[in-house]
Amino acid sequence: MNSLLMITACLVVIGTVWAKEGYLVDVKGCKKNCWKLGDNDYCNRECKWKHIGGSYGYCYGFGCYCEGLPDSTQTWPLPNKTCGKK
């Protein structure tokens, strides 16, 4: 029983360590902007939305940075997107 608990705990830790992270993007392929660096309610809320699926978000380099994202979530920079430029 203890072995099963230990294996389960290890899998949870590995999943957390290997989770994707990065800057959120808008429809133009740009980083979602933020102005209050560090802990930021807006970024945390955006990262945790159901369609995003992140575990935590904060403002870093004036962009919303998310941790614990699923692989399906797009992060900045996007290939073939120039952030609204032609």
Curated annotation (Swiss-Prot):
Binds to sodium channels (Nav) and inhibits the inactivation of the activated channels, thereby blocking neuronal transmission. Expressed by the venom gland. The keyword Disulfide bond applies. Has the structural arrangement of an alpha-helix connected to antiparallel beta-sheets by disulfide bonds (CS-alpha/beta). SMART domains: Knot1. InterPro entries: LCN-type_CS_alpha_beta_dom, Scorpion_toxin-like, Scorpion_toxin-like_sf, Scorpion_toxinL, Scorpion_toxinL/defensin. Residues 20-84 form the LCN-type CS-alpha/beta domain. Keywords: Amidation, Disulfide bond, Ion channel impairing toxin, Neurotoxin, Secreted, Signal, Toxin, Voltage-gated sodium channel impairing toxin. It is found in: Secreted. It holds the Pfam family Toxin_3. Residues 1-19 form the signal peptide. The modification Cysteine amide is found at C83. This is Neurotoxin E1x. Disulfide bonds join C30-C83, C34-C59, C43-C64, C47-C66. GO terms for molecular function: sodium channel inhibitor activity; toxin activity. GO terms for biological process: defense response. GO terms for cellular component: extracellular region. It comes from Centruroides sculpturatus. Belongs to the long (4 C-C) scorpion toxin superfamily. Sodium channel inhibitor family. Beta subfamily.
